[in-house]
């Protein structure tokens, strides 16, 4: 069975729009871009459309490699800007850690600055990474996480690692296993899990025989195969488990949360 993520995203957007109206001013998101990646540019276009729908001001700043860090620091002191997003992927020569560390902490609506990531160790979710939070929101709608055996396949800084911390948080209380490319007997681990989250960047990686019947599967994958968007989960898994679709799944909720974070940042800055 496919999980209806669009309804979750719409609910988040409706609440965000209500909060925008109560602010008394128009919050603003600035997306900084130094990439020619087609999928990144497409996402920026979708951000513009979503911002207009929600009543949020939006601007794209196209900068050179030499300007990106200084631009991010300037945005930190610009009182007209409430949220800052950095388009990725970066060119191979870029120092990703330096760039992400330059995103203003109080405007880091995507949750990429190491300072915001570090707060997750203390169960503080001010601006958690949007994709990881999207997975959590979907799971909380589908089930009670307490005591559930969750396997996260993938250990990236933006999804796997922060998601594991968020699932362990007191009040959620999941039992979490993190797997990766060196994990032995992966199928045995996933097959004994109530929930499997896959974020490995390999189309149709998780097969039907790797999942137990009735499990919940969160597909975070974004892969283009013959020009078509495919997830990390094989479509056959849907026959025995509840699965988030690709497209129209986690990505929908991720974008909705990005703009929820913009409003949260605006509310915090107003105080």
Curated annotation (Swiss-Prot):
Q: In which pathway does it act?
A: One-carbon metabolism; tetrahydrofolate interconversion
Q: One of this protein's Pfam families, by short name?
A: THF_DHG_CYH_C
Q: What residues bind NADP(+), as annotated?
A: 154-156, 181, 222
The EC code for this enzyme is: 1.5.1.5, 3.5.4.9
UniProt GO MF annotations: methenyltetrahydrofolate cyclohydrolase activity; methylenetetrahydrofolate dehydrogenase (NADP+) activity
* Keyword Oxidoreductase among UniProt keywords: yes
Single GO biological process annotation from the record? purine nucleotide biosynthetic process
In terms of domain of life, where is this protein from?
Answer: Bacteria
**Reactions catalysed, as given in the entry:** (6R)-5,10-methylene-5,6,7,8-tetrahydrofolate + NADP(+) = (6R)-5,10-methenyltetrahydrofolate + NADPH; (6R)-5,10-methenyltetrahydrofolate + H2O = (6R)-10-formyltetrahydrofolate + H(+)
Instruction: Output the Gene Ontology cellular-component terms.
Output: cytosol
Instruction: Give the record's keywords alphabetically.
Output: Amino-acid biosynthesis, Histidine biosynthesis, Hydrolase, Methionine biosynthesis, Multifunctional enzyme, NADP, One-carbon metabolism, Oxidoreductase, Purine biosynthesis
Q: What does this protein do?
A: Catalyzes the oxidation of 5,10-methylenetetrahydrofolate to 5,10-methenyltetrahydrofolate and then the hydrolysis of 5,10-methenyltetrahydrofolate to 10-formyltetrahydrofolate.
Q: Record's family?
A: Belongs to the tetrahydrofolate dehydrogenase/cyclohydrolase family.
Quaternary structure and interacting proteins, as annotated: Homodimer.
Q: What is the protein name stated in its UniProt record? A: Bifunctional protein FolD
Organism of derivation: Thermotoga sp. (strain RQ2)
What taxonomic lineage is listed for the species of origin? Answer: Bacteria, Thermotogati, Thermotogota, Thermotogae, Thermotogales
Q: Which gene encodes it?
A: folD
